[in-house]
């Protein structure tokens, strides 16, 4: 889990939230991680994404190594009316690396989409 959580931050282990994430990840053991990965193999919801009819915000860090950028783009292209946002100089932990920017983007999205509710 240490190697994985290192990739969640552009700064790697020197990021202030790295120790917290590393500790949280220690609860997972190798066997359970393998079972999760096997369960996900071959599973896809791509054919059902077009059924989503709720406002959807997709946020990805431009330096995310945990999820492929193409996965986020695929979500954006297949969820009708979705909004796609790339946070600069962020990895998988974009919400921890740039919390002010992340919160502004989420807040603006919620305000915009709550107008009609």
Where are these regions (language model features)?
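Conserved alpha/beta-hydrolase catalytic His-Asp/Glu region
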Residues: 1-51
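Short beta-strand/loop motif that positions the catalytic acidic residue
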Residues: 52, 58-60, 64
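Catalytic active-site module of serine/aspartate enzymes centered on a nucleophile-bearing elbow/loop
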Residues: 81-117
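Conserved catalytic core of Hanks-type protein kinase domains
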Residues: 27, 78, 96
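Active-site acidic short loop of glycosyltransferases
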Residues: 53-54, 80-81
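Conserved alpha/beta-hydrolase "acid-adjacent" motif
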Residues: 65-71
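Hydrophobic "lid"/C-terminal helical patch
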Residues: 4, 37, 75, 102, ...
């Amino acid at each position: 889990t240490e190697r994985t959580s290192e990739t969640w931050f552009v700064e790697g282990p020197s990021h202030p939230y790295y120790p917290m994430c590393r500790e949280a990840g220690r609860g997972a053991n190798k066997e359970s991680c393998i079972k999760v990965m096997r369960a996900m193999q071959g599973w896809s919801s791509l054919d059902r994404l077009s059924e989503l009819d709720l406002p959807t915000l997709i946020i990805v860090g431009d330096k995310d190594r945990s999820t492929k950028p193409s996965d986020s783009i695929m979500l954006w292209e297949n969820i009708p009316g979705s909004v796609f946002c790339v946070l600069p100089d962020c990895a998988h932990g974009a919400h921890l690396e740039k919390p002010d920017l992340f919160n502004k983007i989420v807040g603006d999205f919620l305000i915009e989409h709550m107008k009609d509710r």
